Amino acid sequence: MRIKKYTKVRLLVNCCLLLFFLIDCGADRQSLYKDLLASLIYISDNKNIGSTNSDLTGSGSVSSSPADAAPENSILANSIPENMGIKILTHNVFLLPKTLPGWGNWGQNERAQRIVSSNYIQNQDVIVFDEAFDTDARKILLDGVRSEYPYQTDVIGRTKKGWDATLGLYRTDAFTNGGVVIVSKWPIEEKIQHVFKEKGCGADVFSNKGFAYVRIDKNGRKFHIIGTHVQAQDSGCANLGVVSRVNQFNEIRDFIDSKKIPKNEMVLIAGDLNVIKGSREYHQMLCILNVNNPKYVGVPFTWDTKTNEIAAFYYKKVEPAYLDYIFVSKSHFQPPIWQNLAYDPISAKTWTAKGYTSDEFSDHYPVYGFIYADSSTPTKSGRKRKYDRVSFVSVATGKKIQANSEKSNAWLKVNATTETDLTKFNLVQTNDPDSNPSCMKSGHVRIESSHSLNYFWNWWLGGGKGNYAYYPKFNDGSNRIQIINLDGGCLQDGSRVAFKDYDTISRRQYFLTVWEGGNWDKYLYLWRSHIGLREIFYLKLDSSPEMNWSKKLIYR
């Protein structure tokens, strides 16, 4: 009798959703939702209509099947021929113009080279790159992937040459192009660039943002892809640019409608859509674009200030967000399932720009879109490094070194009794280009707070009794600190280590010690000329497993 029990609730939900669609979508969009509302009447008991952003991640509850219960263009699971499936990747690669004031050189050329040689871009049918603004870096990227993806568009908004058509409001006086490029393994039969008539607000007004449209032929099957990067959530915009994004989404939808694409051909929209997953704006976006809610798997965010060093550099206090998507148009060919997988790879080799060393490809993580997972689909996080999130336990006191929970650059103290994010630190030997070495030995090391990325161990010399005490300093670690493995060989779990640094005043090296007594008891100091118990620490490697979503993927 459960059906009777929930009948009134479902009726109320459907009425509310109907009102929401009528308000949000406008009269010209209302007809698009008849099938959706009909399907909601028969929604199963375990459907989670009200999932939040975090609930949606990897759950598959509302996204394990297309939004329509029986879409007109759907087909049965496991009945898709290979040429009817497609694997598409979108990645905002953060290749800003090197001349951009306030941003400058973020290793654009080096990162483009790392992307070219990476594994994460392999085995796709189509890739949409966003923020490929910089001319030199973009050339490195496109030339480098050409052997696998020989069919390519130019970046949108740079020139009208080479396109079958240029639509929208193309501006010759724009400071920079639109940053979007599409590359394909399969022949591109048609390519159109559309520069948004809604040119946006804030910093976006200086670029020719819009979208690239391509029609590709994969073994006789036509696919239509729109790659885009819409208005950023800019503090210089009213309501963080919501109105501009709505107008730009409408331009995308109107373009799709104008193309009169056959209903049995698949239409995809991919890129950095700058809308937070699970928000009210997110559902409005799905409505305007007339796309299905995908099944989400992978990491919970595509722009993560807690795990990505570049994202954290400028926006440490901003919460992580899921902003990048690959959607399927509901008015066209419907696969039995559509999955979006957010992945967090790191470069196998580090890069250095203006003294800053990192292994990040970008400030965003890539997203894969596909019908069924296969052997090449990532099944776990790419961020499990041996010498990340290590902790140090004092041999003398049994307490752990920890950062401060309230202030990223407050003093380091050796007083933690339990393991937390504050007791975790990332080790990098910047002279070793291997981003994930299996064997780190004694030598110079950069020690970063796992809790506050880009804050590195340094010692204070600004007066007072705090002189020579250690604290995490933003983007400025001691470049002479060394880790000494007292047991010799590779650093392992349980290795006894000491730290040695150089005093620029006395021009002598000293060992770091746990201060004993007085107001500075348990603080970490550069002080001792010899090693005793208070200078020795046990190294503890992180034993927690990497995030694994293999059981949430759907395979053929």
Swiss-Prot record:
Any one GO CC term of the record: extracellular region
InterPro entries referenced in this protein's UniProt entry, alphabetically: Endo/exonu/phosph_ase_sf, Endo/exonuclease/phosphatase, Sph/SMPD2-like, Sphingomyelinase/PLipase_C
Pfam families: Exo_endo_phos
Keywords of the record: Hydrolase, Secreted, Signal
Keyword Metal-binding: no
E.C. code: 3.1.4.12
Gene3D superfamilies tied to this protein: Endonuclease/exonuclease/phosphatase (3.60.10.10)
Catalytic activity: a sphingomyelin + H2O = phosphocholine + an N-acylsphing-4-enine + H(+)
GO molecular function, one term: sphingomyelin phosphodiesterase activity
Keyword Signal: yes
Subcellular location: Secreted
Range of residues in the leader sequence: 1-27
PANTHER family named in the record: SPHINGOMYELINASE C 1, SPHINGOMYELINASE FAMILY MEMBER
NCBIfam families the record matches: sphingomy
Protein name (record): Sphingomyelinase C
UniProt organism field: Leptospira interrogans
Gene that this sequence comes from: sph
